[in-house]
Curated annotation (Swiss-Prot):
InterPro entries cross-referenced by the UniProt entry: Agouti_dom_sf, Spidertoxin
S-S bridge residues: C17-C31, C24-C37, C30-C48, C34-C57, C39-C46
Family note: Belongs to the neurotoxin 02 (plectoxin) family. 02 (plectoxin) subfamily.
Chief localization: secreted
Expression tissues: Expressed by the venom gland.
Species of origin: Plectreurys tristis (Spider)
Keywords, ordered alphabetically: Disulfide bond, Knottin, Neurotoxin, Secreted, Toxin
A cellular component annotation (GO) from this entry: extracellular region
Domain statement: The presence of a 'disulfide through disulfide knot' structurally defines this protein as a knottin.
Function: Potent toxin that may paralyze and/or kill insect pests such as H.virescens (lepidoptera), S.exigua (beet armyworm) and M.sexta (tobacco hornworm).
Propeptide: 1-13, 60-61
Location in the cell: Secreted
The protein's name: U1-plectoxin-Pt1b
Lineage: Eukaryota, Metazoa, Ecdysozoa, Arthropoda, Chelicerata
A GO molecular-function annotation: toxin activity
């Protein structure tokens, strides 16, 4: 399977990226709609593990 770099890929087949971002940094656009996401250092490969339910990225409550 050929892997392509995409800004957002909420899929189990998404490549596990380097540089685990458990919460949004505010500097990674791939984490805009996620509370938990995986992104590489460049922010090229990202996967949303848990979509945010609030308007603030990083809010856990």
């Amino acid at each position: 399977e050929e892997q392509v770099n995409v800004p957002f890929l909420p899929d189990e087949r998404a490549v596990k990226c380097i540089g685990w971002q458990e919460t949004c940094n505010g500097q990674l656009p791939c984490c805009d709609g996620c509370v938990m996401c995986e992104c590489n250092i460049m922010g090229q490969n990202c996967r949303c593990n848990h979509p945010k339910m609030t308007s603030e990225c990083g809010s856990r409550r």
